[in-house]
Amino acid sequence: MRRAGYLHLYGLNLVFDRVGKGPPVLLVAEEASRWPEALPEGYAFYLLDLPGYGRTEGPRMAPEELAHLVAGFVVMMNLGAPWVLLRGLGLALGPHLEALGLRVLPAEGVEVAEVLSSKLSYGNIDLGGNL
């Protein structure tokens, strides 16, 4: 079940959905509805509505600004170092998020479960205490 919440950050009420329990995984696209598929169990997913999209009011921002907003969300929500899956507009944030020290994976055109399972099968994702 998706649970909606918001975080007041940089003068904006950033709206997000949270689904599940487990290690945190952040899903970033224009809005939470860009992730319609069923999400796998065993993770705590955070699905953001970026400013100017979905339920988050505010001006649309440049990718660099959005990356700082996403990084601020991670810090304020005390998520540690989650994997950030990107789709749509989120893909433009990838290089900026990496420059800020976040770990990103593209997820355009594939199911979240497929992205996570393919990376897990190659041992590229540490789901232990190092998230």
Q: Which ranges hold each PLM region?
A:
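Conserved hydrolase catalytic core segment
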Residues: 80-111
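Conserved beta-strand scaffold positions in the cores of enzyme catalytic domains, especially
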Residues: 6, 45-47, 104
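Active-site loop/oxyanion-hole signature of alpha/beta-hydrolase fold enzymes
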Residues: 47-87
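N-terminal cap/lid segment of alpha/beta-hydrolase-fold proteins
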Residues: 1-13
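Helix-rich cap/lid subdomain of alpha/beta-hydrolase
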Residues: 103-131
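Alpha-helical elements of Rossmann-like donor-binding domains used by nucleotide-donor carbohydrate transfer enzymes
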Residues: 2, 34, 65-72, 92, ...
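Short loop/turn positions at the edges of beta-strands in beta-sheet-rich folds
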Residues: 10, 20-22, 78, 88
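Conserved HGGG/HGGXW glycine-rich cap/lid loop of the alpha/beta-hydrolase fold
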Residues: 12-57
